[in-house]
């Protein structure tokens, strides 16, 4: 086992604070409407330009082991805030640095770190309660657009496109962000259920302009196995042909004789039919087939439930108003499923979302809910270069998370004002002793830090602005974008309550851990000198005389 350095007390904390400052100073230049960019080196390709606090934090690894421990702990603040609220990472980092800085002064003065921590917790608890009281529900599309704009660094076009997407697919709908092809941002909305499987043969295309197969008022056959033998399908095809309607077949696979026969019948115009593969894999495929069955009012033909292809009747088939099948996607519009059944299915999936342990599973389940409930909106981000595209896409994703947080817990005045008003509303918070009072006092001072940093990045005098804002009341604050004072909500400078709350709680949590640290253990630096040079020569091999050949 490698040798370790063990450092105690003030020296350990001082080195940790150095690491905190290096990381926080790099992150906080991005805060506010006049915050600057940070350029991140990439091992290959163009560098990444970002104004996203958590992206900057994740890149930082320090050479000094003890400084690095401090930096990594603050990195945890940023990434936790990003995971929980989706935004507010820079605010959280600034708050953590401010609490650590203030707190270290008290620890150095001989105060009890555990009592300081209890004081910090009391102050945070009181401030969070006030933030929740001040929170206002987001009701209008305009407010959602404003939240998105602020989160995307005052880019109104991003806020507007997110608000439009939420209008179209509802607040629960899935909104995905993709690279666009043009210079402008575009919004595509897919109504109904879309899944990423296209036609199995281009001969099914009946609309050459769209390069797609369009079926009006079709039956939908759902089968969870492979179809290779046309004999299995014949009874179903005959019933559908008699009804004079088209047929969409969704199965694990359709190939061989079965696919060839379907193609021939389509070309000859005997039957309008399209075959596609079922979406997903394994258990997820079964679940998605069941979703489609409920949406279209049909059944999944599976041997497990005693149904076989030969015995299928029209009552077992699903129905839809319209189906569009492209090369890569299939969209089912206006399925004939009962609204009550769809609602029950959505409820069931929501319970699974709450129980899901991995982010990937949760995301896939949320997609299924959206496909059943409303639809999917696609925001295509436009930019001139790839570097700009990456930066803009990250901002759109941040703004999307922020608007979701605003819908969830409401909004408060932005620009660091909500924290100052919470401090005023909380009144006098009392600790059990002088050291706890000091912990409370340091939090109440530290929460000025986000506003101070916004003003500093805008080139203003922080103390003057903070005093002016404290002298006001309600939503009165400072708009750093144009150096004016006024009502923050009216000016459209809003923060989601969840983002502000999470930033404060996470910052205080990690800062408290640092203040109560008394010892640090790190791997000792390797002694470079010890490995230098080759060992001395091999000292002559003596005479080898007498060895007559």
UniProtKB/Swiss-Prot annotation:
Pfam family for this entry, one: Cpn60_TCP1
CDD domains: GroEL
GO BP term (any one): protein refolding
Location(s), subcellular: Cytoplasm
A single MF term (Gene Ontology): ATP binding
Binding site for ATP: 30-33, 51, 87-91, 415, 479-481, 495
Keywords for this protein: ATP-binding, Chaperone, Cytoplasm, Isomerase, Nucleotide-binding
PROSITE patterns: CHAPERONINS_CPN60 (PS00296)
Entry annotated with the keyword Isomerase: yes
Record field: catalytic activity: ATP + H2O + a folded polypeptide = ADP + phosphate + an unfolded polypeptide
A GO term from the CC aspect: cytoplasm
EC number: 5.6.1.7
Family annotation (Gene3D superfamilies): GroEL, GroEL-like equatorial domain, TCP-1-like chaperonin intermediate domain
Function of the protein: Together with its co-chaperonin GroES, plays an essential role in assisting protein folding. The GroEL-GroES system forms a nano-cage that allows encapsulation of the non-native substrate proteins and provides a physical environment optimized to promote and accelerate protein folding.
Record family assignment: Belongs to the chaperonin (HSP60) family.
HAMAP family per UniProt: CH60
Assembly, per entry: Forms a cylinder of 14 subunits composed of two heptameric rings stacked back-to-back. Interacts with the co-chaperonin GroES.
Protein name per the record: Chaperonin GroEL
Organism: Leptothrix cholodnii (strain ATCC 51168 / LMG 8142 / SP-6)
Native organism taxonomy: Bacteria, Pseudomonadati, Pseudomonadota, Betaproteobacteria, Burkholderiales
Gene that produces this protein: groEL
């Amino acid at each position: 086992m490698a040798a370790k350095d063990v450092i105690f007390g003030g020296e350990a904390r001082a080195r940790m604070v150095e690491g905190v400052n290096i990381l926080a100073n790099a992150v906080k230049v991005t805060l506010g409407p006049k915050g600057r960019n940070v350029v991140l080196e990439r091992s290959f390709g163009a560098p990444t330009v970002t104004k996203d606090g958590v992206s900057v934090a994740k890149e930082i690894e320090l050479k000094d082991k003890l400084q690095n421990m401090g930096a990594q702990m603050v990195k945890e603040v940023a990434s936790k805030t990003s995971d929980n609220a989706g935004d507010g990472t820079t605010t959280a980092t600034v708050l953590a640095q401010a609490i650590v800085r203030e707190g270290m002064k008290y620890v150095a003065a001989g105060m009890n770190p555990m009592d300081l921590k209890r004081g910090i917790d009391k102050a945070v608890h009181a401030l969070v309660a006030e933030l929740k009281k001040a929170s206002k529900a987001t009701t209008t599309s305009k407010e959602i657009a404003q939240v998105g704009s602020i989160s995307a660094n005052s880019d109104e076009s991003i806020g507007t496109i997110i608000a439009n997407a939420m209008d179209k697919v509802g607040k629960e709908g899935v909104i995905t962000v993709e690279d666009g092809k043009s210079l402008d941002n575009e919004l595509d909305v897919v109504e109904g259920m879309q899944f990423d499987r296209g036609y199995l043969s281009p001969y099914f295309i009946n609309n050459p302009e769209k390069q797609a197969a369009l079926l009006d008022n079709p039956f939908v056959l759902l089968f969870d196995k492979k179809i290779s033998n046309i004999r299995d399908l014949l009874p179903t095809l005959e019933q559908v042909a008699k009804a004079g309607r088209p047929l969409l077949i969704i199965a694990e696979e359709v190939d061989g004789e079965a696919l060839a026969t379907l193609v021939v019948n389509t070309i000859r115009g005997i039957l309008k039919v399209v075959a596609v593969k079922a979406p997903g894999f394994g258990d997820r495929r079964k679940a998605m087939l069941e979703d489609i069955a409920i949406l279209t009012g049909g059944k999944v033909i599976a041997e497990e439930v005693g149904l076989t292809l030969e015995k299928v009747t029209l009552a077992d088939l699903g129905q839809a108003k319209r189906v569009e099948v492209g090369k890569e996607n299939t969209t089912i519009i206006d399925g004939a499923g009962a609204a009550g059944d769809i609602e029950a299915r959505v409820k069931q999936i929501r319970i699974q979302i709450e129980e899901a342990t991995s982010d990937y599973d949760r995301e896939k389940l949320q997609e299924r809910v959206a496909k059943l409930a409303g639809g999917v909106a696609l925001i295509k981000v436009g930019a001139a270069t790839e570097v700009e595209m990456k930066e803009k896409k990250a901002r759109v994703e941040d703004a999307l998370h922020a608007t979701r947080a605003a819908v969830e817990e409401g909004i408060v005045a932005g620009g660091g004002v909500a924290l100052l008003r919470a401090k005023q509303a909380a009144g006098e918070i009392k600790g059990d002793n002088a050291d706890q009072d000091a912990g409370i006092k340091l939090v109440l001072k530290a929460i000025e830090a986000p506003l101070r940093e916004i003003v500093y990045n805008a080139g203003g005098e922080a103390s003057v602005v903070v005093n002016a804002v404290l002298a006001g009341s309600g939503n009165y604050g400072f708009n750093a974008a144009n150096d004016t004072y006024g009502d923050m909500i009216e000016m459209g400078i809003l923060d989601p309550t969840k983002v502000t709350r999470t930033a404060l709680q996470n910052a205080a949590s990690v800062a408290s851990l640092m203040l109560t640290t008394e010892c640090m253990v790190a791997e000792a630096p390797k002694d470079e000198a010890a490995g230098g040079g080759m060992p001395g020569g091999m000292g002559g091999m003596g005479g080898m005389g007498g060895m007559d050949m």
